Protein backbone atom coordinates (compact mmCIF):
# COMPACT_ATOMS: atom_id res chain seq x y z
CA UNK A 1 0.00 0.00 0.00
CA UNK A 2 1.13 3.53 -0.81
CA UNK A 3 0.31 6.37 1.59
CA UNK A 4 0.36 10.10 0.93
CA UNK A 5 1.00 12.30 3.98
CA UNK A 6 -0.27 15.79 3.21
CA UNK A 7 1.47 18.22 5.54
CA UNK A 8 3.58 15.25 6.61
CA UNK A 9 6.51 17.34 7.80
CA UNK A 10 4.38 19.88 9.70
CA UNK A 11 3.91 20.21 13.43
CA UNK A 12 1.14 17.58 13.55
CA UNK A 13 1.92 15.59 10.43
CA UNK A 14 5.50 14.70 11.28
CA UNK A 15 4.36 12.75 14.34
CA UNK A 16 1.95 10.72 12.25
CA UNK A 17 4.68 10.16 9.65
CA UNK A 18 7.17 8.95 12.26
CA UNK A 19 4.58 6.59 13.73
CA UNK A 20 3.73 4.93 10.40
CA UNK A 21 7.28 4.77 9.02
CA UNK A 22 7.86 1.27 10.39
CA UNK A 23 4.52 -0.20 9.30
CA UNK A 24 5.62 -3.25 7.32
CA UNK A 25 2.46 -3.27 5.20
CA UNK A 26 3.45 0.02 3.56
CA UNK A 27 5.26 -0.11 0.25
CA UNK A 28 5.81 3.63 -0.01
CA UNK A 29 5.21 6.80 2.01
CA UNK A 30 5.20 10.21 0.34
CA UNK A 31 5.61 13.27 2.54
CA UNK A 32 3.97 16.17 0.70
CA UNK A 33 4.38 19.72 1.93
CA UNK A 34 4.12 23.23 0.55
CA UNK A 35 7.71 23.55 1.77
CA UNK A 36 9.45 21.15 -0.61
CA UNK A 37 12.87 21.46 1.03
CA UNK A 38 11.43 20.64 4.45
CA UNK A 39 9.58 17.60 3.08
CA UNK A 40 12.69 16.26 1.35
CA UNK A 41 14.89 16.91 4.38
CA UNK A 42 12.46 15.22 6.76
CA UNK A 43 12.18 12.21 4.41
CA UNK A 44 15.95 11.69 4.72
CA UNK A 45 15.47 10.64 8.35
CA UNK A 46 13.68 7.47 7.17
CA UNK A 47 14.54 4.58 4.89
CA UNK A 48 14.26 4.53 1.11
CA UNK A 49 10.52 3.83 1.01
CA UNK A 50 9.88 7.38 2.28
CA UNK A 51 10.22 10.32 -0.11
CA UNK A 52 9.46 14.02 0.17
CA UNK A 53 7.82 16.21 -2.46
CA UNK A 54 6.59 19.76 -2.75
CA UNK A 55 2.83 20.09 -3.20
CA UNK A 56 0.44 23.01 -3.04
CA UNK A 57 -2.95 21.53 -2.10
CA UNK A 58 -4.71 24.43 -3.83
CA UNK A 59 -3.22 23.22 -7.14
CA UNK A 60 -6.08 20.87 -7.97
CA UNK A 61 -4.33 19.20 -10.91
CA UNK A 62 -1.17 18.30 -8.98
CA UNK A 63 -3.20 17.25 -5.95
CA UNK A 64 -5.31 14.91 -8.08
CA UNK A 65 -2.22 13.36 -9.66
CA UNK A 66 -0.67 12.75 -6.24
CA UNK A 67 -3.86 11.15 -4.91
CA UNK A 68 -4.16 8.86 -7.94
CA UNK A 69 -0.70 7.46 -7.22
CA UNK A 70 -1.57 6.47 -3.63
CA UNK A 71 -4.05 4.17 -1.90
CA UNK A 72 -4.70 6.30 1.18
CA UNK A 73 -4.06 9.89 2.23
CA UNK A 74 -3.39 11.16 5.74
CA UNK A 75 -4.34 14.83 5.66
CA UNK A 76 -2.86 17.12 8.32
CA UNK A 77 -3.02 20.28 6.20
CA UNK A 78 -4.71 23.06 8.13
CA UNK A 79 -6.59 25.15 8.73
CA UNK A 80 -9.34 22.72 7.83
CA UNK A 81 -12.01 25.36 7.39
CA UNK A 82 -10.02 26.23 4.25
CA UNK A 83 -8.67 22.90 3.03
CA UNK A 84 -10.76 20.07 4.52
CA UNK A 85 -13.66 19.85 2.07
CA UNK A 86 -11.75 20.24 -1.22
CA UNK A 87 -9.12 17.69 -0.25
CA UNK A 88 -11.71 15.10 0.80
CA UNK A 89 -13.64 15.68 -2.43
CA UNK A 90 -10.43 15.21 -4.41
CA UNK A 91 -9.60 12.00 -2.53
CA UNK A 92 -13.02 10.50 -3.26
CA UNK A 93 -12.89 11.55 -6.91
CA UNK A 94 -9.45 9.96 -7.30
CA UNK A 95 -10.27 6.70 -5.50
CA UNK A 96 -8.01 7.33 -2.50
CA UNK A 97 -9.02 6.37 1.04
CA UNK A 98 -8.87 9.29 3.45
CA UNK A 99 -8.17 10.15 7.10
CA UNK A 100 -7.58 13.54 8.70
CA UNK A 101 -7.40 15.53 11.93
CA UNK A 102 -10.08 18.10 10.99
CA UNK A 103 -10.92 20.12 14.09
CA UNK A 104 -13.37 22.66 12.64
CA UNK A 105 -17.13 22.09 12.82
CA UNK A 106 -17.99 24.00 9.62
CA UNK A 107 -16.14 21.72 7.16
CA UNK A 108 -17.13 18.69 9.23
CA UNK A 109 -20.78 19.35 8.36
CA UNK A 110 -19.94 19.56 4.67
CA UNK A 111 -17.63 16.56 4.71
CA UNK A 112 -20.24 14.32 6.33
CA UNK A 113 -22.56 15.22 3.44
CA UNK A 114 -20.11 13.43 1.11
CA UNK A 115 -20.95 10.09 2.75
CA UNK A 116 -23.10 8.74 -0.09
CA UNK A 117 -20.52 9.80 -2.68
CA UNK A 118 -17.80 7.91 -0.79
CA UNK A 119 -20.03 4.85 -0.43
CA UNK A 120 -20.77 4.86 -4.16
CA UNK A 121 -17.08 4.53 -5.03
CA UNK A 122 -16.06 2.32 -2.09
CA UNK A 123 -13.92 4.86 -0.25
CA UNK A 124 -13.43 4.90 3.52
CA UNK A 125 -13.00 8.36 5.04
CA UNK A 126 -12.55 9.17 8.73
CA UNK A 127 -12.52 12.83 9.68
CA UNK A 128 -11.27 14.30 12.95
CA UNK A 129 -9.02 11.46 14.12
CA UNK A 130 -6.71 13.44 16.39
CA UNK A 131 -6.95 14.27 20.10
CA UNK A 132 -10.03 16.52 20.18
CA UNK A 133 -11.69 15.53 18.01
CA UNK A 134 -10.55 11.93 17.88
CA UNK A 135 -9.63 10.46 21.25
CA UNK A 136 -12.45 12.46 22.84
CA UNK A 137 -15.01 11.00 20.41
CA UNK A 138 -13.93 7.46 21.21
CA UNK A 139 -13.97 8.13 24.96
CA UNK A 140 -17.45 9.55 24.54
CA UNK A 141 -18.49 6.42 22.66
CA UNK A 142 -17.16 4.20 25.46
CA UNK A 143 -19.19 6.25 27.95
CA UNK A 144 -22.34 5.96 25.83
CA UNK A 145 -22.03 2.19 25.56
CA UNK A 146 -22.14 1.92 29.38
CA UNK A 147 -25.68 3.34 29.49
CA UNK A 148 -29.04 1.91 28.44
CA UNK A 149 -29.99 5.21 26.80
CA UNK A 150 -28.18 8.51 26.35
CA UNK A 151 -29.48 12.06 26.24
CA UNK A 152 -26.27 14.13 26.61
CA UNK A 153 -22.71 13.68 25.39
CA UNK A 154 -19.91 16.04 26.41
CA UNK A 155 -16.34 15.84 25.19
CA UNK A 156 -13.74 17.97 26.93
CA UNK A 157 -10.09 18.83 27.22
CA UNK A 158 -7.72 20.97 29.24
CA UNK A 159 -6.36 24.00 27.38
CA UNK A 160 -3.13 23.78 29.36
CA UNK A 161 -2.51 20.02 29.37
CA UNK A 162 -0.74 19.63 26.03
CA UNK A 163 2.63 21.10 25.15
CA UNK A 164 2.97 22.96 21.82
CA UNK A 165 4.67 21.10 18.98
CA UNK A 166 8.37 21.94 18.93
CA UNK A 167 9.04 21.06 15.29
CA UNK A 168 7.33 22.05 12.07
CA UNK A 169 8.02 22.79 8.43
CA UNK A 170 5.54 25.64 8.65
CA UNK A 171 6.61 29.26 8.48
CA UNK A 172 4.46 32.27 9.25
CA UNK A 173 1.30 32.19 11.34
CA UNK A 174 0.63 28.86 13.05
CA UNK A 175 -2.35 27.06 11.44
CA UNK A 176 -3.41 25.50 14.75
CA UNK A 177 -3.61 28.94 16.31
CA UNK A 178 -5.60 30.30 13.36
CA UNK A 179 -8.01 27.42 13.96
CA UNK A 180 -8.23 28.35 17.63
CA UNK A 181 -9.04 31.97 16.87
CA UNK A 182 -11.68 30.86 14.35
CA UNK A 183 -13.41 28.65 16.90
CA UNK A 184 -13.17 31.01 19.87
CA UNK A 185 -14.60 34.10 18.18
CA UNK A 186 -18.21 34.74 17.28
CA UNK A 187 -20.71 31.90 17.48
CA UNK A 188 -20.25 28.15 17.15
CA UNK A 189 -22.68 25.31 16.48
CA UNK A 190 -23.83 22.95 19.21
CA UNK A 191 -26.66 20.44 19.63
CA UNK A 192 -29.07 21.38 22.42
CA UNK A 193 -32.60 20.27 23.27
CA UNK A 194 -32.71 18.06 20.20
CA UNK A 195 -31.65 20.61 17.62
CA UNK A 196 -28.61 22.34 16.22
CA UNK A 197 -28.15 25.92 17.36
CA UNK A 198 -25.56 28.69 17.40
CA UNK A 199 -24.18 29.98 20.70
CA UNK A 200 -21.44 32.37 21.70
CA UNK A 201 -18.07 30.63 21.77
CA UNK A 202 -16.59 30.17 25.27
CA UNK A 203 -20.05 30.30 26.84
CA UNK A 204 -19.78 28.86 30.33
CA UNK A 205 -21.18 25.39 30.96
CA UNK A 206 -21.31 23.43 34.22
CA UNK A 207 -19.92 19.91 33.94
CA UNK A 208 -21.04 17.26 36.44
CA UNK A 209 -18.37 14.56 36.22
CA UNK A 210 -19.08 11.39 38.25
CA UNK A 211 -16.75 11.08 41.22
CA UNK A 212 -15.28 14.55 40.74
CA UNK A 213 -18.19 16.95 41.13
CA UNK A 214 -19.37 20.02 39.27
CA UNK A 215 -16.88 22.25 37.44
CA UNK A 216 -17.09 25.13 35.03
CA UNK A 217 -15.90 24.77 31.44
CA UNK A 218 -16.35 26.77 28.25
CA UNK A 219 -18.00 25.77 24.98
CA UNK A 220 -15.49 25.40 22.15
CA UNK A 221 -16.19 25.18 18.43
CA UNK A 222 -15.02 21.62 17.82
CA UNK A 223 -16.73 19.02 15.58
CA UNK A 224 -17.77 16.59 18.33
CA UNK A 225 -20.76 18.79 19.15
CA UNK A 226 -22.29 18.11 15.73
CA UNK A 227 -20.84 14.70 14.83
CA UNK A 228 -22.38 12.86 17.79
CA UNK A 229 -25.98 13.82 16.91
CA UNK A 230 -25.21 13.04 13.27
CA UNK A 231 -24.30 9.46 14.15
CA UNK A 232 -26.68 9.17 17.14
CA UNK A 233 -29.81 11.17 16.24
CA UNK A 234 -31.69 10.09 19.40
CA UNK A 235 -29.48 12.09 21.77
CA UNK A 236 -30.72 15.49 22.95
CA UNK A 237 -27.53 17.42 23.74
CA UNK A 238 -23.94 17.41 22.52
CA UNK A 239 -21.19 19.82 23.53
CA UNK A 240 -17.43 20.14 23.24
CA UNK A 241 -15.86 22.12 26.07
CA UNK A 242 -12.45 23.32 27.16
CA UNK A 243 -11.20 24.27 30.59
CA UNK A 244 -8.03 25.83 31.93
CA UNK A 245 -5.90 24.91 34.90
CA UNK A 246 -6.49 28.41 36.24
CA UNK A 247 -9.21 31.04 35.79
CA UNK A 248 -6.54 33.32 34.32
CA UNK A 249 -6.28 31.01 31.26
CA UNK A 250 -9.81 31.78 30.07
CA UNK A 251 -9.56 35.43 31.15
CA UNK A 252 -6.46 36.03 29.01
CA UNK A 253 -8.04 34.20 26.08
CA UNK A 254 -11.17 36.35 26.26
CA UNK A 255 -9.13 39.58 26.35
CA UNK A 256 -7.13 38.62 23.25
CA UNK A 257 -10.27 37.48 21.43
CA UNK A 258 -12.05 40.75 22.29
CA UNK A 259 -9.15 42.67 20.74
CA UNK A 260 -9.45 40.51 17.61
CA UNK A 261 -13.24 40.80 17.34
CA UNK A 262 -13.01 44.60 17.64
CA UNK A 263 -10.37 44.60 14.87
CA UNK A 264 -7.86 46.18 17.24
CA UNK A 265 -5.52 43.35 16.30
CA UNK A 266 -5.79 40.97 13.32
CA UNK A 267 -6.59 37.27 13.64
CA UNK A 268 -3.03 36.51 12.53
CA UNK A 269 -1.67 38.76 15.27
CA UNK A 270 -3.93 37.14 17.86
CA UNK A 271 -2.80 33.70 16.67
CA UNK A 272 0.84 34.71 17.01
CA UNK A 273 0.22 36.00 20.54
CA UNK A 274 -1.40 32.68 21.52
CA UNK A 275 1.49 30.75 20.01
CA UNK A 276 4.00 32.83 21.98
CA UNK A 277 2.02 32.38 25.21
CA UNK A 278 1.99 28.60 24.70
CA UNK A 279 5.77 28.52 24.49
CA UNK A 280 6.08 30.55 27.72
CA UNK A 281 3.57 28.67 29.85
CA UNK A 282 4.60 26.16 32.50
CA UNK A 283 2.39 23.14 32.00
CA UNK A 284 0.67 21.81 35.12
CA UNK A 285 1.68 18.46 36.54
CA UNK A 286 -0.94 15.75 36.82
CA UNK A 287 -1.06 16.21 40.59
CA UNK A 288 -2.08 19.84 40.13
CA UNK A 289 -5.06 18.99 37.93
CA UNK A 290 -6.27 15.62 39.22
CA UNK A 291 -8.79 17.28 41.56
CA UNK A 292 -10.60 18.96 38.67
CA UNK A 293 -11.80 17.80 35.29
CA UNK A 294 -9.54 15.32 33.47
CA UNK A 295 -7.08 16.55 30.85
CA UNK A 296 -9.14 14.80 28.17
CA UNK A 297 -12.43 12.96 28.52
CA UNK A 298 -15.76 11.79 27.19
CA UNK A 299 -18.88 12.10 29.36
CA UNK A 300 -22.37 10.71 28.84
CA UNK A 301 -25.58 11.30 30.79
CA UNK A 302 -28.64 9.10 30.43
CA UNK A 303 -30.43 6.12 31.95
CA UNK A 304 -29.03 2.93 33.50
CA UNK A 305 -31.34 0.27 34.94
CA UNK A 306 -34.23 2.72 34.98
CA UNK A 307 -32.41 5.49 36.86
CA UNK A 308 -30.57 8.65 35.85
CA UNK A 309 -26.87 7.92 35.45
CA UNK A 310 -23.64 9.30 34.04
CA UNK A 311 -20.31 7.88 32.91
CA UNK A 312 -16.99 9.68 32.51
CA UNK A 313 -14.12 8.16 30.54
CA UNK A 314 -10.51 9.32 30.54
CA UNK A 315 -7.02 7.83 30.65
CA UNK A 316 -5.88 6.15 33.85
CA UNK A 317 -4.01 8.30 36.38
CA UNK A 318 -0.62 6.82 35.52
CA UNK A 319 -1.16 7.45 31.82
CA UNK A 320 -2.16 11.08 32.40
CA UNK A 321 1.21 11.74 34.04
CA UNK A 322 3.01 11.49 30.71
CA UNK A 323 3.63 14.85 29.05
CA UNK A 324 2.84 14.93 25.34
CA UNK A 325 3.20 17.56 22.68
CA UNK A 326 0.25 18.78 20.65
CA UNK A 327 1.84 17.05 17.66
CA UNK A 328 1.98 13.67 19.40
CA UNK A 329 -1.52 13.96 20.84
CA UNK A 330 -2.93 14.79 17.42
CA UNK A 331 -0.72 12.87 15.00
CA UNK A 332 -0.55 9.53 16.77
CA UNK A 333 -4.30 8.76 16.71
CA UNK A 334 -4.25 9.43 12.97
CA UNK A 335 -1.42 6.93 12.56
CA UNK A 336 -3.41 4.37 14.51
CA UNK A 337 -6.34 4.86 12.17
CA UNK A 338 -4.05 3.78 9.35
CA UNK A 339 -2.82 0.82 11.40
CA UNK A 340 -6.36 -0.43 11.98
CA UNK A 341 -7.14 0.08 8.30
CA UNK A 342 -4.11 -2.01 7.31
CA UNK A 343 -5.26 -4.74 9.70
CA UNK A 344 -8.64 -4.83 8.00
CA UNK A 345 -10.39 -3.50 11.11
CA UNK A 346 -11.62 -0.39 9.31
CA UNK A 347 -13.52 -1.71 6.32
CA UNK A 348 -16.69 0.35 5.85
CA UNK A 349 -17.20 2.74 2.96
CA UNK A 350 -18.46 6.24 3.61
CA UNK A 351 -17.52 9.35 5.59
CA UNK A 352 -17.41 8.93 9.36
CA UNK A 353 -16.46 10.80 12.50
CA UNK A 354 -14.46 8.53 14.86
CA UNK A 355 -17.57 7.56 16.86
CA UNK A 356 -19.48 6.57 13.73
CA UNK A 357 -19.17 2.80 14.11
CA UNK A 358 -16.11 2.32 11.95
CA UNK A 359 -13.51 2.11 14.77
CA UNK A 360 -13.64 -0.47 17.55
CA UNK A 361 -12.76 1.40 20.75
CA UNK A 362 -11.07 -1.60 22.35
CA UNK A 363 -8.83 -2.08 19.31
CA UNK A 364 -7.98 1.62 19.20
CA UNK A 365 -7.08 2.12 22.85
CA UNK A 366 -5.07 -1.11 22.94
CA UNK A 367 -3.05 0.10 19.95
CA UNK A 368 -2.73 3.55 21.53
CA UNK A 369 -1.31 2.07 24.74
CA UNK A 370 1.21 0.04 22.74
CA UNK A 371 2.32 3.05 20.69
CA UNK A 372 2.71 5.36 23.70
CA UNK A 373 4.12 2.74 26.08
CA UNK A 374 1.18 3.18 28.45
CA UNK A 375 -0.72 0.86 30.72
CA UNK A 376 -3.73 -0.63 29.01
CA UNK A 377 -7.14 0.39 30.22
CA UNK A 378 -9.21 3.51 30.66
CA UNK A 379 -10.46 5.14 33.84
CA UNK A 380 -14.25 4.75 33.72
CA UNK A 381 -16.23 6.59 36.40
CA UNK A 382 -19.78 5.28 36.77
CA UNK A 383 -22.22 7.31 38.84
CA UNK A 384 -23.99 4.18 40.13
CA UNK A 385 -20.74 2.86 41.62
CA UNK A 386 -19.93 6.03 43.57
Where are these regions (language model features)?
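ADP-ribose/adenylate-binding Rossmann-like module
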Residues: 79, 90-108
Amino acid sequence: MKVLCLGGSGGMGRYATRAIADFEELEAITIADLNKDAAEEFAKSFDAKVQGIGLDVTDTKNLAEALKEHDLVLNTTGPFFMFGVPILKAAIENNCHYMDICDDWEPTEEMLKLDSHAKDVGISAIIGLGASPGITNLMGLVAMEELDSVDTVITGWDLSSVNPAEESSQTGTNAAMIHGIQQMTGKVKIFEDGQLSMVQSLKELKINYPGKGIYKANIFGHPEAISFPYHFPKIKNSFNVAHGSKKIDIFIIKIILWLSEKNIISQDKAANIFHWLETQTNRPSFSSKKAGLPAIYGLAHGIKNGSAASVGVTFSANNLEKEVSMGEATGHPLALGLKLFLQGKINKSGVFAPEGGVIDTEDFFKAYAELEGLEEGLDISRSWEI
